[in-house]
Amino acid sequence: MERLIFYITLITFIFLLFLYPIFIKWLKKRQFGQYIRKEGPDLHNYKQGTPTMGGILFILAIFFLSLLTYFIQKEDLFLIIGVASLLFGFIGFLDDYLSIKKKDSTGLTAIQKLLLQFLFSIVIVYLISIFNNHSTLKIPFTTKSLDLKFFYPLWGIIYLTGMSNATNLTDGIDGLSGGIYVISALFTALIAGINFNHIPLLILPVIAYLFYNIKPAKIFMGDTGSLALGGILGSLALYYSVELFTILTCFIFISEMFSVIIQVGSFKVRKKRVFLMAPIHHHFELKKWSEERIVLIFWTINILTGIVALGGVL
């Protein structure tokens, strides 16, 4: 039955490769295009109108495959991943839809988005407590664990919210966020010890999307996809207590998020910016790095930190 899941995932991947061009045409016909942030780099202005919400297809694929795995194999993790992909994808969908409707890059307000993330994080943390109740964090490069006791639910909510924001912030260059997700999910799943036949369902749908998102991108995942990817990664890490490992397996996502925190904090306290622009990939764009160079270097860095993380499993 494990091989069955693998073969169905493979068929789904091939199906998505053929479905994405049709979906792109459908989005163009309905003028569901991306609105570029005014405060973003001028280099991105030519991307205005590129079809967005491409995350819908890979989210539905991951949701379907996750539920199938849950019902066939009784793997509780995949019920949680399926629910997380749908809930966080819904937040992103609302944001994208409102942005398109208002013909502006702003959809949900920051507070609205954060409240929904907190609410859905509570749901996921509650589900994890039902199926795999624990309060510990595995510490890399040791055999020890850190017990957070009654603080663990709060930690889980903050962690999951942070991870969904991290993946969202990284989605700013063609091929960047999707590629980093594939690398991060692969290494996190290997560290968690997931069955090899089940790992492809986490990454192949996103690889199908990447075929059409590598520069020049024919479609963007939108917040629909980027928020969902963070929900999936965060749920996986929380379920197996490997959150500390994701500092390495999700190194670029974490770095992008902290570059924004550092930038905002520095400007509020010192009235000075640390980076030319945050998230940090925009800093390198303004340094005249090409998108291809940034993506290649960021992918490579995340692969290397992922390998280091594997060495931390004792």
Swiss-Prot record:
Its cofactor is Mg(2+). Pfam families: Glycos_transf_4, MraY_sig1. The keyword Electron transport does not apply. The chain crosses the membrane at residues 4-24, 52-72, 77-97, 111-131, 146-166, 169-189, 191-211, 219-239, 242-262, 294-314. It is found in: Cell inner membrane. One of its GO terms (cellular component) is plasma membrane. Its main location: membrane. Keywords: Cell cycle, Cell division, Cell inner membrane, Cell membrane, Cell shape, Cell wall biogenesis/degradation, Magnesium, Membrane, Metal-binding, Peptidoglycan synthesis, Transferase, Transmembrane, Transmembrane helix. HAMAP family: MraY. Catalyzes the initial step of the lipid cycle reactions in the biosynthesis of the cell wall peptidoglycan: transfers peptidoglycan precursor phospho-MurNAc-pentapeptide from UDP-MurNAc-pentapeptide onto the lipid carrier undecaprenyl phosphate, yielding undecaprenyl-pyrophosphoryl-MurNAc-pentapeptide, known as lipid I. PANTHER family: PHOSPHO-N-ACETYLMURAMOYL-PENTAPEPTIDE-TRANSFERASE, PHOSPHO-N-ACETYLMURAMOYL-PENTAPEPTIDE-TRANSFERASE HOMOLOG. This is Phospho-N-acetylmuramoyl-pentapeptide-transferase. The gene is mraY.
